Every structure is written in C-alpha cells, then in structure tokens.
Amino acid sequence: MLPCSSKIKGYKGVITYGHKRGGKMNNLSRISEIFQSIRLSLESENYFAALTNSLILIDICAKIYAPTEKEPNKRYKKWIDDILITKLTYSNNYLSSSNIWFLRCAMLHEGSSDPTTNISYQKFGKMKVRDIVPTIFPKEFHDKILVADQGDNYPTLFFDLVYFCEMVLSIASDWTNNNVELVKESALNLFSVAHSEFATSNNLIIFRA
C-alpha cells in the first residue's frame, strides 16, 4: 500500500491511497478487461458500448505499435493499415483507415457516427462518404460492408457492426498475444476503477488495480 494522507470535505478520516493488494495490474491484464467489456457488450446487444470500446481498443494498440509517433491520427491509421485491414475477412475501400479514424472522432467526441461532423473531414478525409451507418445485418446476409449511392456527391457506408467489433477484438487479441513483451513494456496508463473500504471507523482505504 502506498500511504497518502488527505482530507475529504465532510469526512474527517485519513485516506490511504495506493494499489490493490498484490501489486499493480499490468497492461495485459487491463487490455484483457477491455476485451471482456467488448464481448459482454456484444452479448447484451449494447452496441454503442461495443463500437466505442472497439474504436478505443484500436487507439491503445496503435500507441503500443507506434509509440514514437506523436500524432494520434497517424499512429491510429498506421495500425489499421498495417494490422487490421490486412486481416479482415471482408474488406471495402470505403472502410478505410481514414474513415475509421473519423468515425472514431465522431463517436468519442459527439456520440455520432457521421464523419462529416468533423470540419477536417472534407479537407483530410480519403474515400469520403456522406455518412457512416453501423448496421445489424440479418445473420443469413453474407455481405458485411455496403456502399450505397444515394444521389449525393459521396456514397453512404454501411458496415456490419457485430462483424467489425468481432474482427477488431479477434485481431487485437491475436496481435497482443504475439507482442506480449511490447505490450508489457509500453508506457500506457490505462483506465482502471478505484475501490474503497473502511480500515477503521476513521480510516478509508482507496485502492486501484
């Protein structure tokens, strides 16, 4: 335990803050929790959580893969181009690293899947589309990615959300398993929840994994 006394407004006890008994969780353990979160989200049909977590997972893999690249968009697209797209069982030029990056920005910043909400899209986007529509296709429908011309300057991109999340999960899982030391040594500070308990009536212990 790492002692760190502090005061909480309305509470006179002493706080001891540190890491959970048994030591810190390593990067692999925390990434495994993200894998599990995506699986559970898909199983419970919480598709918003499944997609946002999948897009965040790409961010994490990209930082491990290209730690010296300071521009997040460049390392994000590099991991997609070098790793993800090369292993997709279905592909389409419109499901590009550029469009996935702008989908990520729209989802995380505005809760939208429309890449055109980003003012940089018209200038920097490649294989531009009118909209990106994550879709739940029938199980018997074999196509996973559709591009529809709706009479506008750019087409609309539809992709199978479950397929995309499952592929990101599978490819990222295989990639981390094949790069264990790289993952362990990466300078990540991944999310984890702190928990608390009373040690005595006047002492609160807060610890995180």
PLM regions and their residue ranges:
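Charged alpha-helical initiation segments
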Residues: 2-48
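Conserved aromatic-histidine-acidic binding/catalytic patches
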Residues: 26, 41-49, 68, 92-95, ...
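Hydrophobic packing residues in well-ordered alpha-helices of helical domains and bundles
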Residues: 31, 50, 97-100
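Short, hydrophobic/aromatic alpha-helical segments in well-folded domains
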Residues: 34-37, 53, 103
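A structural signal for well-ordered alpha-helices, especially hydrophobic packing surfaces
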Residues: 35, 39, 61, 108-111
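Short, contiguous, well-structured surface segments enriched in hydrophobic/aromatic residues
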Residues: 44-89
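Long, charged low-complexity segments
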Residues: 81, 85-197
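Glycine-rich, aromatic-bearing surface loops/beta-hairpins
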Residues: 196-209
